[in-house]
């Protein structure tokens, strides 16, 4: 067994690419570390590995090495990662939303816990004046972020989308270098046209009866670069009629996996990215995001969740496979944001094992829709997607457990207390 571990370590070192960030948009799938590693575990990934084109798999793994000053150094490895290959990002769009909402609050000098009230937008979304999940019964950016990161709440994202505004949302991300990203619509709501999603509700912040900020209803006149993305081989339209042609995804949200991976890196390691790439957040903002990302639903009081539905690993796909049972024996925390819809399952994660001083970043997406029909809800998330994510995370984790490090990481920045 020791010889096998040493053998794979030698193969890994031979395949290492020490570039901090690969500029190419299409990363070679063959003769890479990840390709070698997946082949070594071929039986565990059959039939997924045998038909990676069908499953549209993309993987990015970041090895993290610390120096004597605990500064992180990154080595990225890609498997079939291609910024030109479309996948529906689903709820992963909520990751930049939480950061941009906090960034906007900082620009306005408003605390994240300040009550935020949203006016109605006729025919699109209703007003929000109360929030029964909050301790004080009032909506706020902080409460929306909790619900987004703990259980991937759709309405919470939509309210942040409305606060940020479609045009500002995209321009802010493009200015940070995420030029392939397009956030064009709310999520989890049918029947809103692309034009309707350009409109966002009026928002106000009030504390103790005092108006702190009033934002009028906004309209985005942003011109998006044209796209020709498609999904599936057939789909059910809004009238529940089967259309026997691919769904036009050119007006859907879009985030390449590489952009998601870099967004998470910017949040987890803000000091390791350039100032232009960094979200304008305070240290307390980062600590709040880390806390919400890594917290389990049963550890939350406000909001409080029914743990029969929102179980321990409800949003933990990589390594934990979204399994209800908890049998890990070490202190592992996952800082992540997943998304699943239209047969696409994506997870973007920073994984820590505090007991064994292990840390790594792993992002992956897989398409599990055997019949090719969208909106029929016949997707293989449980039978194919979640087991794939669990095993992929486990393989990288086991490799990291065995990998020798010159300097063990000090992970105290990410050690949280979850008692409330």
Language-model regions, residue ranges each:
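Short, glycine/proline-biased beta-turn/loop segments that scaffold the active-site neighborhood
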Residues: 107-137
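C-terminal motif of bacterial Sec signal peptides marking the signal peptidase cleavage site
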Residues: 14-15
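A short, well-structured edge-of-sheet supersecondary motif
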Residues: 39-81, 114, 362-364
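Sec-dependent signal peptide recognition
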Residues: 2-9
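Active-site-adjacent helix/loop patches that line small-molecule binding or acyl-intermediate pockets
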Residues: 25-45, 49, 53-55, 133-269, ...
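Active-site SXXK
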Residues: 87-116, 362
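Extracytoplasmic
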Residues: 52-56, 74-76, 82-84, 88-93, ...
């Amino acid at each position: 067994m020791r010889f096998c571990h040493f053998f794979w370590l030698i193969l890994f070192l031979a395949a290492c690419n020490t570039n901090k960030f690969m500029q190419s948009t299409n990363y070679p799938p063959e003769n890479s570390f990840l390709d070698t590693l997946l082949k070594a575990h071929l039986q565990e990934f059959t039939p997924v590995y045998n038909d990676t084109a069908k499953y549209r798999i993309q993987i990015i793994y970041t090895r993290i090495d610390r120096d004597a000053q605990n500064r992180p150094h990154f080595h990225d490895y890609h498997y079939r990662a291609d910024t030109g290959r479309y996948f529906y990002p689903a709820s992963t769009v909520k990751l930049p939303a939480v950061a941009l909402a906090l960034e906007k609050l900082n620009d306005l000098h408003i605390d994240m816990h300040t009550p935020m009230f949203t006016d109605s937008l006729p025919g699109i979304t209703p007003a929000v004046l109360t929030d029964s999940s909050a301790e004080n019964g009032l909506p706020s950016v902080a409460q929306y972020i909790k619900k987004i990161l703990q259980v991937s709440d759709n309405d919470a994202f939509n309210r942040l989308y409305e606060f940020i505004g479609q045009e500002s949302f995209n321009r802010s991300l493009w200015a940070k270098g995420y030029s392939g990203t397009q956030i064009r619509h709310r999520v989890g709501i049918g029947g809103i046209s692309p034009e309707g999603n350009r409109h966002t509700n009026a928002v106000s912040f009030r504390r103790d009866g005092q108006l702190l900020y009033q934002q009028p209803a906004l309209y985005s006149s942003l011109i998006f670069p044209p796209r020709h993305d498609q999904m599936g081989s057939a789909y059910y339209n809004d009238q529940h009629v089967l259309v026997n042609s691919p769904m036009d995804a050119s007006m859907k949200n879009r985030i390449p996996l590489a952009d998601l991976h870099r967004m998470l890196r910017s949040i987890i390691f803000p000091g390791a990215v350039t100032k232009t790439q960094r979200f304008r957040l305070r240290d307390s903002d980062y600590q709040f995001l880390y806390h919400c990302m890594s917290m389990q639903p049963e550890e939350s009081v406000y909001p409080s969740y029914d743990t029969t539905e929102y179980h321990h690993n409800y949003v933990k796909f990589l390594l934990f496979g979204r399994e209800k049972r908890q049998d890990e024996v070490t202190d592992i925390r996952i800082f992540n944001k997943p998304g699943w819809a239209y047969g696409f399952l994506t997870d973007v994660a920073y994984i820590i094992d505090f007991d064994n001083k292990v840390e790594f970043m792993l992002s992956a997406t897989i398409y599990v829709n055997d019949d090719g029909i969208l909106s029929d809800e016949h997707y293989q998330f449980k039978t194919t997607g979640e087991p794939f994510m669990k095993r992929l995370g486990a393989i990288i984790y086991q490799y990291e457990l065995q990998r020798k490090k010159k300097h063990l990481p000090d992970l105290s920045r990410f050690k949280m207390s979850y008692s409330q």
